[in-house]
Amino acid sequence: MPTRANKVETAWSALLAGASETRQEHLAPSPLFILRQTLFCVLAAYLFCGAGMVWNDWIDRDIDANVARTKNRPLASGKVTTAQAFVWMALQVIASCAVLHVMLDGKDVHVIPVMIASMLYPFLKRPTAKKLHIYPQYMLAFTIAWPAIPGRAAICGRDESFGETVRYCLPLCTVVFFWTIYLNTAYSYQDVVDDRKLNVNSFYNIAGRHTHLVLVALVCPILACLPLYLTQFQSTWLWVTWMGVWTAAFAVQLALFDAKQPASGGSLHKSNFVLGIWTIVVCSVELLLKARVSI
C-alpha cells in the first residue's frame, strides 16, 4: 500500500483552487488562508492515510508474514499487538476527523466515500474478489483520488455545491486514479513472486509478463485527462512544469522499468513520490504568481 506521501493531490487541488479564487475581484481569499487550509488538508490526509495503513496491515498480517518484503512489519512480525494497533488507528482517525471538521466548516459528508473505500480495500485482495474481477488497486486508487474534492472544498466549499466541486475536480480525480494504479502496480510488482505463491488478488499478478505494456496503457489516460484539468487555469507555468515534466518523467520511468527485475518497480514508485512533491511546489508557485497579479 502506498505511503502517506501519496496524499499530495489534496494539496494540489487546494492550492490551485486558491490560485483560481485569487483572481476574483470581490471576497478573494488571502494567500495565508489558502496556505492554512492546504496545510489542514495535508495533515488530515496524512493522519487518515496512517490509519488506513494500520487497517490494511491489520487485515493482511497473515499474508504479510509470508512475504519477504513485509514479514518484518510490526503486526506481521508480532512486535505490535492487534489491540495496540487498533488504539493507534482510532487515534489517527479521530484526529483526522477533527481537522476535517474545522477545515470543511462542518461539511464532513465529503469524506464518507473515502472512509468506506478504505475499509473495503484490504478485503479485495482475497480470491473471492478475484472471481468478481474486482482488484484492490481500483479501491486504493479511489481512496487516493477522492481527497482532491475535500481539497477544493476547503477553499471553495462555502460558495460551491457538492456537485460543482466534483465537476471541477473530476479530471484531476481521474488523473490521480490512474496514476495511483500505475505507481501501485509498479510498487507491488516487487512482491510478485511471493504473491503468486499465496494467490493474492492483484492487478500485477493478472498482467504477468505484460506488466510493462499495462504500465504504458495506464499512462495514457493520465496524459489525456491532465490537460482537461489544467485548461481551466489558463497558466503557461502549469503546462510547462506539470504537464511537461510529468510527460518526460513517465517516458524515463517506462524506459527504465524491467519486468524481469521486480525491484525496478520500487525505483519507479520512488520516482513518482518525487513527482508528487514537485507538483506541490509547482502549485505553490502558481498560487504566488496569481496572488501577485491580483495585488
From Swiss-Prot:
The keyword Transferase is assigned to this record: yes
UniProt GO BP: terpenoid biosynthetic process
Cofactor(s) recorded in Swiss-Prot or TrEMBL: Mg(2+)
InterPro entries, per database record: Prenyltransferase, UbiA_prenyltransferase, UbiA_prenylTrfase_CS, UbiA_sf
Location of this chain's protein in the cell: Membrane
Keywords: Membrane, Transferase, Transmembrane, Transmembrane helix
Pathway entry: Secondary metabolite biosynthesis; terpenoid biosynthesis
Positions of transmembrane segments: 39-59, 84-104, 109-124, 131-151, 168-188, 213-233, 237-257, 271-291
Enzyme class: transferase
GO function term, MF aspect, one: transferase activity, transferring alkyl or aryl (other than methyl) groups
Record-linked Pfam families: UbiA
Assigned EC number: 2.5.1.-
GO CC annotation: plasma membrane
The keyword Transferase belongs to this UniProt entry's keyword annotation: yes
CDD domains in the record: PT_UbiA_COQ2
Practical applications: Diterpenoid pyrones display various biological activities and subglutinol A shows insecticidal and anti-HIV activities.
Membrane topology: Multi-pass membrane protein
Record-stated family: Belongs to the UbiA prenyltransferase family.
Main function: Polyprenyl transferase; part of the gene cluster that mediates the biosynthesis of the diterpenoid pyrones subglutinols A and B. The first step of the pathway is the synthesis of the alpha-pyrone moiety by the polyketide synthase dpmaA via condensation of one acetyl-CoA starter unit with 3 malonyl-CoA units and 2 methylations. The alpha-pyrone is then combined with geranylgeranyl pyrophosphate (GGPP) formed by the GGPP synthase dpmaD through the action of the prenyltransferase dpmaC to yield a linear alpha-pyrone diterpenoid.
Full protein name: Polyprenyl transferase dpmaC
Species of provenance: Metarhizium anisopliae (Entomophthora anisopliae)
